[in-house]
Regions:
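Acidic-and-aromatic substrate-binding clefts and catalytic sites of carbohydrate-active enzymes
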Residues: 17-23, 41-54, 118-122, 159-165, ...
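N-terminal pre-domain/capping segments
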Residues: 1-107, 266-292
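A cross-domain feature marking catalytic cores of carbohydrate-active enzymes
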Residues: 12-16, 42-46, 66-72, 112-114, ...
Length: 292
C-alpha cells in the first residue's frame, strides 16, 4: 500500500525551544500548533517536573499527538542491557516510572534508545547474552507500556552514543528477538548519516514497525541543503503502510539556547519558529512534490 500525501504528519521536539519542560511552557505548544504541527515530543527525566495531566488536557484541546522521550536526567545505572543485573533491574523500574508519567501526559508513544543508555558506548566485543537480556527487558517493558496504552519505540543511534543498536537492521532484529507486538522503531536522519549507506533501504527494512522519523540534516540543522538524501527518504516513506510521522529534532542554540550542553557548537537553531517554518516547509515540499 502506498502512503498518500495527507497521511504525513509533522511535528517537533521541545528541544527546539528549551531543554526542560515546565508548567510555564504551554505557549510553546500553542506556537507549534499555530505553525501547523500536530505532533509534539516532550522529554522526561529525574530533573523534570510539571503537571502531566495539564499537558494532556492542553494537547488534547489543540489536537496535538504527544510522544514522550527520556531525554533529560537518565541515570547511567538505569540500563536494560547492562552487564550488571542490578543496573538492568533499576533500568526496568526507572522506565516504568517514566511510562507512568507518560500515561498521565496522554502520550501515544515512549521513544528513545531505551534498550540501553545513550551515554554508554562500550568499545569491547559484545557479551553473548547482551542482546538476549536487552530483548527480554524490552519485552517486559513493552507489555507494561501496552497496559498503559502507550507504544514502546526504540531508536537506533550512532556509534558515538551507544554500541548496541546503530542501524535499522539491528533495530528490527532486536524487536523481533523481543517478540512483542507493542514494539516499534523511531529512525533519525541525523544518526543514519553515520550508520546507514542507503537511507531508502534502511527505511524499507523498518517499515513494518516504523512509528516515526526524527528529521534533521547531517549537522542537526533544519532539513534541506545538507547531506541527507531526502528524495530517497521520501520515496521509501511513501511506501509505508499507515501514517508517516516526521518530527523535527534539534537543540536550541544562540544566547537563549543550550546546544553546547548537547554537543552542538554551531548556531543552528537560534529561532525555533524560523527553524520550524524552514524545516517543515521543506519536508512538506518533499512529501507533496506535485505532478511530474
Amino acid at each position: 500500500m502506498t502512503s498518500k500525501a495527507n497521511e504525513f504528519r509533522f511535528g517537533a521536539h521541545q528541544f527546539l525551544w528549551k531543554s526542560h519542560w515546565t508548567d510555564a511552557d504551554y505557549g510553546i505548544l500553542d506556537q507549534a500548533r499555530a505553525l501547523g504541527l500536530t505532533l509534539f515530543e516532550v522529554s522526561l527525566g529525574d530533573d523534570v517536573a510539571f503537571d502531566y495531566r495539564r499537558l494532556r488536557r492542553h494537547a488534547e484541546a489543540l489536537g496535538v499527538e504527544l510522544s514522550i522521550g527520556p531525554g533529560n536526567d537518565w541515570p547511567m545505572e538505569c540500563d536494560l542491557s547492562h552487564d550488571d543485573p542490578g543496573h538492568r533491574a533499576r533500568g526496568l523500574a526507572w522506565h516504568k516510572r517514566m511510562l507512568e508519567r507518560a500515561a498521565e501526559c496522554g502520550a501515544a508513544a515512549y521513544c528513545g534508545a531505551i534498550y540501553s543508555h545513550p551515554g554508554r558506548a562500550c568499545r569491547r566485543p559484545p557479551p553473548a547474552d547482551e542482546w538476549p537480556r536487552a530483548a527480554e527487558n524490552l519485552g517486559l517493558l513493552a507489555e507494561f507500556a501496552s497496559g498503559l496504552g502507550i507504544r514502546l519505540v526504540i531508536e537506533p543511534v550512532s556509534r558515538f552514543r551507544n554500541h548496541l543498536v546503530n542501524t535499522s537492521r539491528q533495530a528490527m532484529e532486536l524487536v523481533e528477538l523481543a517478540g512483542h507486538p507493542n514494539l516499534s522503531i523511531n529512525l533519525d536522519t541525523y544518526h543514519m548519516i553515520t550508520e546507514e549507506r542507503d537511507y531508502g533501504a534502511a527505511i524499507r527494512r523498518a517499515a513494518a514497525r516504523l512509528w516515526c522519523v526524527h528529521a534533521c540534516e547531517n549537522d542537526r540543522g533544519a532539513p534541506g541543503g545538507g547531506l541527507v538524501p531526502w528524495p530517497a527518504v521520501f520515496a521509501a516513506l511513501r511506501e509505508v503502510d499507515g501514517p508517516v510521522r516526521l518530527l523535527l529534532e534539534a537543540y536550541r542554540t544562540g544566547p537563549e539556547g543550550f546546544g553546547f550542553s548537547r554537543g552542538i557548537f554551531q548556531d543552528l537553531c537560534a529561532d525555533p519558529e524560523a527553524f520550524v517554518k524552514q524545516g517543515i516547509g521543506f519536508l512538506q515540499t518533499q512529501a507533496n512534490p506535485g505532478p511530474r
